[in-house]
């Protein structure tokens, strides 16, 4: 009941999050409304720019935050691999990257459809009963916390403490990944959840 109430309160801060195609790895394809992304399995002909991730299947949201409280939900469906969270606007976009707070990423994810991890150093294994089809993410900048929730079970999954950073590091942006680049891609989309469904 405690987490049910907590999640309900956080959902009041739900905002509109759109994915930024200019940051998306060339294998990733966004829908026209910018609310979902999938791995096409092929390198698409997209404009090169400094914002684009070129070595991992990552992308960021268009909107960034420097203050306040913000909540969003992502439907991961039946995907076996994914990662979600936030990244500093200043993160490196080119070459091999490691998802970790010291590199400007506060992220949790799923590997092999069975194991859930917080990408700390070293990784922290998360205890999750069953599948996680929908993830709630709550960013409280004044409290310096990022929390993940199992929306279906209304249960807390993990909370990061965000290190104090200077304004030079820029905004915090929602982060998304469809997982490792494999030869046989999982083409199911990651989708932004538009409303709050009390039944889920």
State what each model feature region is.
Residues 1-200:
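Beta-rich ligand-recognition domains in immune and ubiquitin systems
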């Amino acid at each position: 009941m405690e987490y049910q109430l907590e999640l309900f309160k956080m959902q009041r801060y739900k905002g509109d999050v759109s994915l930024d195609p200019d940051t998306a790895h060339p294998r990733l394809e966004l829908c026209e409304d910018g609310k979902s992304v999938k791995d096409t399995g092929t390198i698409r002909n997209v404009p090169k720019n400094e914002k684009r991730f070129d070595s991992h299947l990552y992308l960021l949201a268009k909107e960034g935050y420097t203050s306040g409280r913000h909540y969003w939900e992502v439907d991961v469906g039946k995907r076996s691999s994914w990662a979600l969270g936030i990244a500093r606007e200043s993160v490196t976009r080119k070459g091999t990257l490691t998802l970790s707070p010291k590199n400007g990423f506060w992220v949790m994810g799923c590997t092999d459809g069975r194991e859930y991890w917080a990408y700390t150093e070293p990784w922290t294994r998360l205890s999750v009963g069953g599948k996680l089809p929908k993830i709630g993410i709550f960013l409280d900048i004044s409290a310096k916390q990022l929390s993940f929730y199992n929306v279906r079970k209304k249960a807390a999954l993990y909370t990061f403490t965000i290190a104090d950073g200077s304004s030079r590091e820029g905004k915090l942006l929602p982060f998304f990944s469809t997982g490792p680049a494999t030869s046989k891609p999982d083409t199911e989309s990651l989708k932004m959840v538009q409303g709050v469904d009390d039944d889920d």
